[in-house]
Amino acid sequence: IYISYIFPIYYISYFKMEETYNLYSPNLTVFFEDSLKGNFNKLKRIFSHMLADLKLGKKLQLHVKGFSSPLHKREYNINLSKRRIQSFVNYLRLYENMSFSPFLKSGFLEIIELPFGESKSTKKVSDNPNDKLNSIYSLDAILERRIEIIDVKLIDE
């Protein structure tokens, strides 16, 4: 399952900057309206199914990849990917009055973190900070700054 930009804070920050992004890349409206909102709704559905399984006593393992654009050095980007994953875990912990928190604490919900940094980024994205269009504001650059839920596994014991 591919889900990017899933936290309300990211949505809010991107939507607040939509006008700035559109100055550089005027065709981003579809991304803001369809992709961001659609992926957030997918995430809520996934959370609903996960919560139902956890409440039935099932144990789950969630595999989450973190990515970054190539704008900074490799080590920085790996750490940035880790922070993105941690932001997701923090959001999960606080979701709907901390519904997932007891399952995270008890180990019934385990998060497997897979930080990739810039290693999977497309060559279309510039690593030159002076090339703001291709390093920050292009759709390709935006899509590099993400996390992906790649698997939700039911753990049999």
Tell me what each language-model feature is:
Residues 27, 34-49, 75, 79, ...:
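Extracytoplasmic/secreted proteins, especially bacterial periplasmic and envelope-associated proteins
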Residues 66-68, 81-84, 115-117, 151-153:
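A mature extracytoplasmic/lumenal domain signature
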Residues 70-74:
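Short, solvent-exposed loop/turn segments at secondary-structure junctions
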Residues 2-4, 9, 15-23, 41, ...:
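Periplasmic OmpA/Pal-like peptidoglycan-binding modules at the C-termini of bacterial envelope proteins
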Residues 13-14, 33:
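Conserved, compact domain cores that house catalytic/ligand-binding motifs in diverse enzymes
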Residues 1, 64-69:
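Short loop/turn segments at strand-loop or loop-helix junctions that form parts
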